[in-house]
Amino acid sequence: MASDRQNLQDAFLNHVRKTKVPVTIFLINGVKLQGVITWFDNFCVLLRRDGQSQLVYKHAISTIMPSQPISLYEGEDAS
């Protein structure tokens, strides 16, 4: 049963990718990146801004902050 559930990280990234919500990504060295997440996997995130793409490795990411409030598992039982 537990394996049927998507982990929080994947659910969050998939939601902001599908809805094209702009995000701010803070790296562990303090750099701030902004754009829209277009793709992700277990190791990296593809961030797009002004027609340019940046491949960002997850181990370098400190925080991902969406530009607007998001609701995960809308309409589903989150328990």
Swiss-Prot record:
InterPro entries on file: Hfq, LSM_dom_sf, Sm
Gene Ontology biological-process entries: regulation of DNA-templated transcription; regulation of RNA stability; regulation of translation, ncRNA-mediated
GO cellular component, one term: cytosol
Pfam families referenced in this protein's UniProt entry, alphabetically: Hfq (PF17209)
SUPFAM superfamilies for this protein: Sm-like ribonucleoproteins
GO molecular function: RNA binding
Signal peptide, first to last residue: none
UniProt entry keywords in alphabetical sequence: RNA-binding, Stress response
Domain Sm: 10-70
Family, as annotated: Belongs to the Hfq family.
Function, in words: RNA chaperone that binds small regulatory RNA (sRNAs) and mRNAs to facilitate mRNA translational regulation in response to envelope stress, environmental stress and changes in metabolite concentrations. Also binds with high specificity to tRNAs.
Subunit note: Homohexamer.
Protein name: RNA-binding protein Hfq
Species this chain originates from: Roseobacter denitrificans (strain ATCC 33942 / OCh 114)
